[in-house]
Amino acid sequence: MLGQLVFDEGRGGPKRALLYGLPVLRCQADPEGFWGERRLKRAGHSLYTGGAVRALVPAGFDRWPLLLKLGLRPVDPGAFLRAQAAPLAATLLERQGLSPDRATVALRGHRADGEMLRAALALCPRVRRLTISAPRGGEQLAAWLRREYGLPILPADAPAQAALLLQPGTEPGDAGPCPALTLFGPEPDLAGLRLSAPDLAPTDREDLPLLSALWEGGRLTPGQLKIT
């Protein structure tokens, strides 16, 4: 169950609701004033005991240590962003004045996994070449892609015009001089790109945790996303 914390002066316990068609357990709390922290604790406890393990929170929320102690955690946008790796990389190249079909993109991580494979397969029809840098399984993945699909995979240290950092432990500096997209962690770095869902309310369109939850729940499709 996904929880949703809403800042409001209303009272009452958690209620089941639909958020753009996605079932959530919603709880209201007023964080202001002398009793604000107590109200937040009560709301967080209600969400957790109601079955929520992850929670969506208002923009700018800075009380996560409190919710983490109660057993709640944020929605990680990483998987959602990695699923958009190909269009994000293509847009990043175009922002540099480069045609994707004439550019090289680097995929970087600690190990070659299913997400890296899917990113490679999605990118190959769009870009000219790929490089794969992953100490665990990277060379094997590159060899398999060459053998099975005839894909142009360059050595891991070959220069690239854009890099996708797919896993924790990889840093923008690892990509060399080319711009990099950090597609993991609670604060991903999209190198100035903006991923949005224009059909949502203005305050929700660029809320990555919300977009991630909607994508996970089948309520958001690639055609509903916009990269600017």
What positions do the PLM features span?
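Metallocofactor- and cofactor-centric catalytic cores in central/energy metabolism, strongly enriched
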Residues: F7-A17, G21-P65
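Adenosine-phosphate binding glycine-rich loop
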Residues: F7-Y20, Q28-E32, P179-T228
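A short, well-structured beta->alpha microelement
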Residues: E32-H45, E139-Q161, T170-P172
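Glycine-rich phosphate/diphosphate-binding loop of Rossmann-like nucleotide-binding domains
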Residues: R95-P159
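Rossmann-like adenosine-cofactor binding region
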Residues: Y149-P202
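Structural motif
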Residues: V6-D8, A29-E32, V57-F61, L107-R111, ...
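Short loop/helix-cap segments at secondary-structure boundaries that form the rim of catalytic
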Residues: K15-L18, W64-G71, Q140-L145, A160, ...
